[in-house]
Amino acid sequence: MVINNNISAINAQRTLKFRQVDLKK
């Protein structure tokens, strides 16, 4: 379960990064 939580957190960080890039565009 801890691993799943870590993966979800990493995915959230990735989505935030992609959103920031889109905003920059």
Curated annotation (Swiss-Prot):
Cellular compartments per GO CC: periplasmic flagellum
Official protein name in the record: Flagellar filament core protein flaB1
Quaternary structure, from the entry: The flagellum consists of an outer layer composed of two sheath proteins, flaA1 (44 kDa) and flaA2 (35 kDa) around a core that contains three proteins flaB1 (37 kDa), flaB2 (34 kDa) and flaB3 (32 kDa).
UniProt-annotated location(s): Periplasmic flagellum; Periplasm
Chief localisation class: periplasm
Lineage, opening ranks: Bacteria, Pseudomonadati, Spirochaetota, Spirochaetia, Brachyspirales
Function: Component of the core of the flagella.
Gene this protein is translated from: flaB1
Keywords: Bacterial flagellum, Periplasm
Similarity comment: Belongs to the bacterial flagellin family.
